[in-house]
């Protein structure tokens, strides 16, 4: 969650190479082994192409201070839930983000729900330290929350939450989330477009990640 864990020098080098029309060998990070890997994925952009870079440190000037300002356009993306259970009880945006993360971590990082829940306080602190202070530097803000996402996530996250042992400290939070999900009727993912933002978490997307 900290920018110190990133290879900023390599990132800067690659971005400048792309902006100069050169081809780069794109590395990927294996969250299970904790190592950088190369799988032959090459990238080159044309003169009129747009390079999209996504990440929690995207608004932090330290990440791109070697990139020309006129080559950057900053977008702040956040899942801000607009749904209320009733006139007095709103659905916290943080619950939606946690459910997203539980599903994604299970599918791509080899973490079970208990482990993701146990790290959630640290993630929230990381948001306070590394994301929220830089919101004001964004050129535009985009709300990534989808009206149907909790109904779709339900089928993925319920089995994961049910797998949290009663003996673990995370059991109480798992039960709270399960009770919260009872308010939603689950739906399948057949009608979720392959280019939907939700595909980042449930898989089946059309973009290379």
Language model regions located:
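Conserved nucleotide-sensing/catalytic segment adjacent to the nucleotide-binding pocket
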Residues: 1-34, 50
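Glycine-rich phosphate/ribose-binding loops and adjacent secondary-structure elements
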Residues: 8, 40-45
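Short gly/ser/thr-rich secondary-structure transition/capping motifs
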Residues: 31-39, 122-125
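Extended, charge-rich C-terminal regions with high alpha-helical propensity
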Residues: 33, 43-44, 133
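Short loop/turn elements that form and flank the Walker-type P-loop nucleotide-binding site
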Residues: 45-47, 69-70
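Structural recognition of the conserved hydrophobic beta-strand(s) that form the central parallel beta-sheet
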Residues: 50-54, 75-76
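Short beta->alpha connector loops
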Residues: 56-59
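Conserved NTP phosphate-binding and transfer environment spanning the P-loop NTPase/kinase superfamily
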Residues: 61-209
